[in-house]
Amino acid sequence: MPHDAEAHYCGLPDIYRGEDVPLSNIHHITWDDIDGKTPFRENKELQKQLLKLMKKYPYMAHNAAFEDSWFKIHLDGYAEARRAGKIIVIDSRQICRSLDADVRSLPRESAPAALENWARRRGTLAADANEQHLGLDDTDLMLRTVQAEFNLKNLFAK
């Protein structure tokens, strides 16, 4: 069970100054949130801490190919550790596609395997609520949704 969760804001390279924060309309992160923060690529201590955790515990992400490719580019030592089998990635979207029969019957354009839609079907996200697109909030939603799916399918040991 996850514990002692942390969230870190990292800065952006100066090339983005004077522009909108990329994807701020999705993540709701503003320049005020990241002003004075070290960019992730330059924050070697945070990278070291994250890589250590990733080698110790598997990590789960919804559409994990995105995180996996991002970390390969931006996290020193990740690609080598991943290739050596020291980092295990679990994709909750693949869990959804494999276990949730609704995915096969709903129209593809309705994005049935999207975390928000899957969570609504499993009752872990209210019909009038939205996925936050913020690390800890979405991680909590993802884990509760996976647990709900596993409970529905009686996949937990008794």
What are these regions, as identified by a protein language model?
Residues 1-75, 109-123, 133:
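Conserved non-catalytic scaffold segment of RNase H-like nuclease domains
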Residues 66-68, 96, 150:
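Glycine-rich nucleotide phosphate-binding loop and flanking beta-alpha elements
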Residues 67-90:
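Substrate-recognition/cap helix-loop segment adjacent to the acidic, metal-dependent catalytic center
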Residues 90-110:
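Short alpha-helix plus adjacent loop in nuclease-associated cores
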Residues 104, 119-121, 136-158:
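Acidic two-metal-ion nuclease catalytic site recognized across multiple nuclease folds
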Residues 128-137:
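A short glycine-threonine-serine/GTX helix/turn-capping micro-motif
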